[in-house]
């Protein structure tokens, strides 16, 4: 065999191989690479969108937590205010009740003192009448001298 013929046959075989690769294998391979690049780009874009969505969701969660804390603090403040109102109302009611009880006790004391004074006046009147009877050695008519005895009792 001739070296030129071998070289020419190899060159033709190589050219045929290049032509087959360029027409049959290269386009599908490039399409597959482009599709893969496109999928990777879409995946990266989806990851970016997901990251943005996550950041937005995190902001919403933080805002909701802030609102919940604010509402909880408001509820706690309202509960404290209500508790203070209840305590103040109970204190005022206790003061009112104590004042009422004190007034009732004072009224009872005054009534008892008045009864004691009245009893004492009656006893003094009776003693005065008895003493006068003994001094005069005669009985004084209580009905006849009642006005005089009442005046004497009121002075005592």
From Swiss-Prot:
It is found in: Cell membrane. F-type ATPases have 2 components, F(1) - the catalytic core - and F(0) - the membrane proton channel. F(1) has five subunits: alpha(3), beta(3), gamma(1), delta(1), epsilon(1). F(0) has three main subunits: a(1), b(2) and c(10-14). The alpha and beta chains form an alternating ring which encloses part of the gamma chain. F(1) is attached to F(0) by a central stalk formed by the gamma and epsilon chains, while a peripheral stalk is formed by the delta and b chains. GO terms for cellular component: plasma membrane; proton-transporting ATP synthase complex. InterPro entries: ATP_synth_B-like_membr_sf, ATP_synth_b/b'su_bac/chlpt, ATP_synth_F0_bsu_bac, ATP_synthase_B_chain. Keywords: ATP synthesis, Cell membrane, CF(0), Hydrogen ion transport, Ion transport, Membrane, Transmembrane, Transmembrane helix, Transport. F(1)F(0) ATP synthase produces ATP from ADP in the presence of a proton or sodium gradient. F-type ATPases consist of two structural domains, F(1) containing the extramembraneous catalytic core and F(0) containing the membrane proton channel, linked together by a central stalk and a peripheral stalk. During catalysis, ATP synthesis in the catalytic domain of F(1) is coupled via a rotary mechanism of the central stalk subunits to proton translocation. It is a single-pass membrane protein. Its main location: membrane. It holds the Pfam family ATP-synt_B. Belongs to the ATPase B chain family. This is ATP synthase subunit b. It comes from the Bacteria. One of its GO terms (molecular function) is proton-transporting ATPase activity, rotational mechanism. The chain crosses the membrane at residues 3-23.
């Amino acid at each position: 065999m001739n070296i030129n013929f071998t070289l020419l046959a190899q060159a033709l075989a190589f050219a045929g191989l290049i032509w087959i690769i360029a027409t049959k294998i290269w386009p599908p391979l490039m399409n597959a690479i482009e599709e893969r690049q496109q999928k990777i780009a879409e995946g990266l874009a989806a990851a970016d969108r997901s990251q943005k969505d996550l950041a937005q969701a995190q902001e919403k969660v933080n805002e909701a937590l802030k609102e919940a804390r604010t509402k909880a603090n408001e509820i706690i403040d309202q509960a404290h205010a209500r508790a203070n109102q209840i305590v103040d109302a109970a204190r005022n009611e206790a003061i009112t009740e104590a004042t009422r009880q004190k007034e009732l006790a004072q009224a009872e004391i005054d009534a008892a003192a008045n009864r004691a004074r009245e009893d004492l006046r009656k006893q003094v009147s009776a003693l005065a009448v008895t003493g006068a009877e003994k001094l005069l050695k005669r009985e004084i008519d209580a009905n006849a001298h009642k006005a005089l005895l009442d005046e004497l009792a009121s002075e005592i």
